[in-house]
Each structure stands twice: as structure tokens, then as C-alpha cells.
Amino acid sequence: MASSLRALYAVLAMVLLGVLASRSALASGAVTLVLPYLAWGTLIIGVCYRVWRWARVPVPFRIPTTCGQQRSLPWLPRAPLENPDNAMGAALRVGFEVLLFRSLLRNNRPRIEEGRLAFSPTRALWLGALAMHWALLVIVLRHLRFALEPTPNWVVSLGALDGMLQIGAPPVLLTDLALFAALLYLLIRRWRDPALRYLSLFSDYFALWLLLGIALSGIAMRYVWRVDVVAVKQLVLGIVTFHPQVLSAPAPLLLVHLLLVCALAIYLPFSKLMHLGAAVLSPTRNLANNSRRRRHVNPWNAPVPTHGYAEWEAEFADKLKLAGLPLEQDQDARHPTAD
């Protein structure tokens, strides 16, 4: 019951945002004049603050998580990507993690099968997450055509590649379908799985519903209730060049879409959606595993008085001689080294 209420609250929050955009923004123009700058200022400052906080956390130990053979004897095959021993390997590992979600691809889910513990891969989750993130990235890059004048050729080519199937008019974009299907799958998965539903918080549902609301409002503006693309570009260019303007013709769906995007920008630095920065800055990912070849001394350790072997041997020399044990200082005296 509690998990159902959390999902319902997330839906109600989305409806409230939509009503707020369609009602108040038409009268005051707050969504087009004030909110974009507030949202992007919060996003930039919030992300920089979170990264600064993470960067200040001390890492006293080298703690990379590995799943392959590290560099060792020459005749042992090693895994340079799974267990990197230098900075280049660690950078490649982080890059593949960010771009391909390799740890999620290897993720297994435990289950009880015929009274025994079994593990099954979660390839569907990996594919859904990968499709959602890549589709979202391509959509953001496509939207640069509204913020840049003239539009770069690579943005035009990216839009043409996205609509290469040429289905309908305007053509159906593959990333629109991929983003909608991936978000719907992630929502259904979180709702159908009893254990996952029990562990889900309001923030988990709200992030998915917010992204789904942005996707649906954008799809509706392209295929159902079309808006004036020229007016949209003028609006976005005005925001980017710090000359904001109010829409000449009412466009409630566009205002809802813009409000949801601004809400996402404000919400992102304070939510789990900041996991991209965490993946890059995580010491379990971005450190090389070379502790066997190189000693890493904690720079902020307090100086500790040491008692080396030479001092220990000098202290107990008489007892060692009585026990008949050889002394290194005697051997050094018999075999002096030439300078």
C-alpha cells in the first residue's frame, strides 16, 4: 500500500506541474522569462557543488573493484580493462562504464528455483537503461537546432539519421520510440516486482514520471498538437542570448514541456540522477590496481616513529649472538661494498 501511494504521489506531482504551467504561465510568462534562468543556474551551481563535495572526500586507500586477473607474472594472462594497472587503463574502464554500462551488463539477480539459489542475468534491465540514456543524449543533441543559429551540419545529419525510416510526416524519430519504450519498461519493472516496489521511494517514481512527461509532451507537440517551430526557435534563441520573450500565440503544451524540462534541471543536482558524476569520480572505478607494484602512502597520515631491522638488531645483538644467529652487521663488515 505504501509503495502504491508513493507512485500515486509522483503522478500527482507531475499533474500539478502540468496544471501550473498551463494556468499561471499563460498569464505571467514566468516559464519563458524567469524559470529557464533559475533552472539552469540551479543546475550549474548544484552540479559544481556536488562534484566539489565528492572531490573533497579523502580516499586513504586504493580500493578499485576488479573482476579479472591483475598484472602479475609474465606467463599469467591479465585483463587490462577489467583490472587496469595504469591511468590509461583506468580511463578506458571508466569510459566503457559510462558509455556501455559494463557492470550492469554483468549484473546477476538471485532467485530461488526448486529450493535452490540460482542466479540469472539482467540483460533486459541493461538494454532498457542503455536505450534510455543513449536516446536521451541524442534527443538533447538534436534540440541544439533550436539554440544555435545557424544550425551546425552535424546536428542536421543527426536528425536525418534519427528519422531515417521516413515513416509518416513528419518522420517518426527512432529515439522518441526508444525513450518512451525504455521509460515505460523501467516503470513497469519497478511496479511489477514486489521486492523492487517495496524498496522504491517517491524519488524513484518521480524521476521516471518526470522524464516520461517530458518525452510525452515532446512527442505530442511533434505528432499530435503541432506547434510553430519558428516561434519555438525564436523563444529558445531569446533565452540563450539573454533576450527572453513571451510567446506571441498561446501554446500550453509547449509551456508544459518547458516547465518539465526546467523542473528536471532543478531536481537533477539533488537527486539520484547525479549518478553520472558519481560513476566518474568513484575510487572503485577510476583508480589503477597497482598496489602490488607500488606503495601508496597516505599523505595526511601523522608521522609515526618506526623501529627498523637495523635498530632492532643493534638492540638485541648480544642475545642474537648467544643464540648463534647470524647478524647482518657482521656480514657487512666482512664483505664491505665498494663505493
Region spans (language model):
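Alpha-helical transmembrane segments of integral membrane proteins, especially early/N-terminal helices
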Residues: A2-L12, V51, N83-F96, L125-R142
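Membrane-proximal intrinsically disordered regions of secretory-pathway and membrane-system proteins
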Residues: A2-L5, V11-V15, L20-A25, L38-I45, ...
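Long, highly hydrophobic alpha-helical transmembrane signal-anchor segments
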Residues: L5-T66, L237-V256
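Long, hydrophobic/aromatic-enriched structural stretches that serve as scaffold segments
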Residues: A10-G18, A87-A118, T122-L125
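Long, contiguous internal "core" modules enriched in hydrophobic/ aromatic residues
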Residues: A27, L104-F242, V246-P252, V256, ...
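Membrane-interface amphipathic/juxtamembrane segments adjacent to transmembrane helices
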Residues: L35-L99, N290-R294
